[in-house]
Amino acid sequence: DLTAAYTFGSAGPTLSVASLWWAGQGAGDYFNFKSHETAHHFEAGLAYTLPIEKLPLSIAWNFMFAGQDKDENGNQNYSSYVELNFPFTVKGVDLNATCGVLPYDAGITTYGGDVNSGFAVTNVALKATKDIKITDSFSLPIFTQAIWNPRMEDAHLVLGISLRP
């Protein structure tokens, strides 16, 4: 996936454009960008965080404007995804609550082959991050995230570390 993004000012909205490749290895020519042949999804996004210290809610709206996101007649679906994020801290642990939705019917096919027929909650998540002090000069940032997709009746638990220079 390739993404270019620009944030307007220090606290303004962020505009992004992405080329998403979900086809995997051996799925065709990565550099084929022809509308009805490409395996790319081209997506535009707009994100903004409310400038309210006690309510740092962010909202992002992304939609596919070209590429493989087609309906059964070969027309562009303009599939969209809207996500809300709310960061907060409890007892020294940084948390982030997420809720993502498909706002309308755009012919999106789920991994199980079902077509989404309208508004659907597709991402409910809670992520916890904590820096574990190893020495006076080094901390290990660890995280865990519980993710649930009610539309697909699917859940995941992710554990990880972040290494920064």
Predicted regions mapped to residue ranges:
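Flexible domain-boundary/linker segments
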Residues: T3, T144-Q145, I161
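Outer-membrane pore/translocation modules
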Residues: D1-N85, A106-F119, V158
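Outer membrane beta-barrel transmembrane domains
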Residues: D94-T135, S139, F143
